[in-house]
Amino acid sequence: MVQLPAMKRVKGRAPLSVVVAIIGGLALAGIIFTEDLRGLTEVKEKVTDKEKKRTSLRTVMRTSALLSADQPPPPAVLSVEPATATPPPAPKMAFNATRCSVTDGYWAYDRSKKLPYTDQTCPYVDRQDSCQRNGRPDSDYLYWDWHLDDCLLPRFDPVSMLEKLRGKRIMFVGDSLQLGQWLSFVCLVNSAVPDTPGAKSMERSRTLSVYTVKEYNASIEFYWAPFLVESNSDRNIALGAGGRVLHVDAIEEHGKHWRRADILVFDSYVWWMTGYRIKSVWGSFGDDGYEELDAWVAYRLGLKTWANWVDSNVDPATTRVFFMSISTTHMRSEDWGREGGIRCYNETWPITQRGYRGSGSDRRMMEVMSDVLGRMRTPVTLLNITQLTEHRVDAHVSVYTETGGLLVTDEEKTDPQRYTDCIHWCIPGVPDTWNRLLYAHL
């Protein structure tokens, strides 16, 4: 019997099932290792990014510290995103009467501004308004300009203004505030007129005053009519407020002087605001009795009489008509936070709060004014000076004025409660800005 030789076992060789299991295990381990490695790599990248940001932040902080110490920055390139540049403010457009708001603006101080005149160089400024000549010690109030938010308000150009007035009459009509605007206008124009004999002339009277410039055949006039309608105090100015009687439906005695003017500039407000009810009559002053009306009721009647006269007598093709809004008074220092103050006395700086409104302008009267003007057939431009005057508590004549025709004395100045005038304005001063608005509209 032949025996077959025995088979030899090969070392290290495993059964196929074992091999397959081992290979599968190795593959799974490889996958797990790869995922772990990827995770470790991502963490490392995140840490690296954070470190980069920290490094950049530290670099910026060091640079800021160096800059604040007035030292040059290190020569390193900062790894930060560029800052977004702030766009420059939009350029203001040239003044356009229909698109520009004269009430949206602010007062800016400019000590370098050259004054076109002073109360010493212009011989026509009344003593009542000559603050510097009357001894006012400060002058900052002279160097503020009204800037519009969106538009450029042009400077008053006296030569250009005279060209506009060549062969024409401009007449200012109203009360003592309007008289101040007229004087300001005259002084602005006069700054461009030579002081040669016959080049100009001035005639003053209680009712009508006329400044003429011969070369331009231009006439700049003022007519006194504080209520616009007729009253028993038109000529008797010294008559007390309680004794005034208005003829609310009569105006022709005044109106006959306004005809044939090329430009009419009206104002009427402060004389209505005495605190008294307005004694009003219809028909002749000789009639017995009168009716006492609230100021705003009488004001509406008077303005309607004026509006009817304008609509009946003014040709819009040949005459421009303007109406000045309320010139603000400053009678309550509490309005602007000056507790214990005496009205505008010793105020040397404007109120800078945007849109400030105090108690010195009656809104109901303003509404009456706007309503009457809005119903007229004749185009009338309302020059809204109310907001810009609200801020100028510093620019009134205060105690540097006259009262009863006499200059306030040094002794009287020690009693500001009695002698401070916070209605009228120093000239030069705020009325020059009113005339800038007028010039811009012309």
UniProtKB/Swiss-Prot annotation:
Q: Respond yes or no to whether keyword Transmembrane helix is given for this record.
A: yes
Its lineage reads: Eukaryota, Viridiplantae, Streptophyta, Embryophyta, Tracheophyta
GO MF annotations for this entry?
Answer: O-acetyltransferase activity; xylan O-acetyltransferase activity
Q: Where the protein is mainly located, per its record?
A: Golgi
Keyword annotations of the record: Disulfide bond, Glycoprotein, Golgi apparatus, Membrane, Signal-anchor, Transferase, Transmembrane, Transmembrane helix
Protein name per Swiss-Prot or TrEMBL: Probable xylan O-acetyltransferase 8
InterPro entries reported for this sequence: TBL (IPR029962), TBL_C (IPR026057), TBL_N (IPR025846)
Topology, Cytoplasmic side: 1-13
Q: Which organism is it from?
A: Oryza sativa subsp. japonica (Rice)
Which segments sit on the Lumenal face? Answer: 35-442
Can you list the disulfide-bonded cysteine pairs?
C100-C151, C122-C187, C131-C426, C344-C422
Per the UniProt entry, the Enzyme Commission number(s) are: 2.3.1.-
Q: Name one GO biological process term.
A: plant-type cell wall modification
Q: Where is the active site?
A: S176, D421, H424
Question: What is the membrane topology here?
Answer: Single-pass type II membrane protein
Q: Could you tell me which Pfam families the record lists for this protein?
A: PC-Esterase, PMR5N
Q: What Gene Ontology cellular-component terms does the record carry?
A: Golgi apparatus; Golgi membrane; plasma membrane
TM ranges are 14-34
Would you identify the family this protein belongs to, as annotated?
A: Belongs to the PC-esterase family. TBL subfamily.
User: What domain of life is recorded for the organism?
Assistant: Eukaryota
Protein purpose = Probable xylan acetyltransferase required for 2-O- and 3-O-monoacetylation of xylosyl residues in xylan. Possesses extremely low activity in vitro.
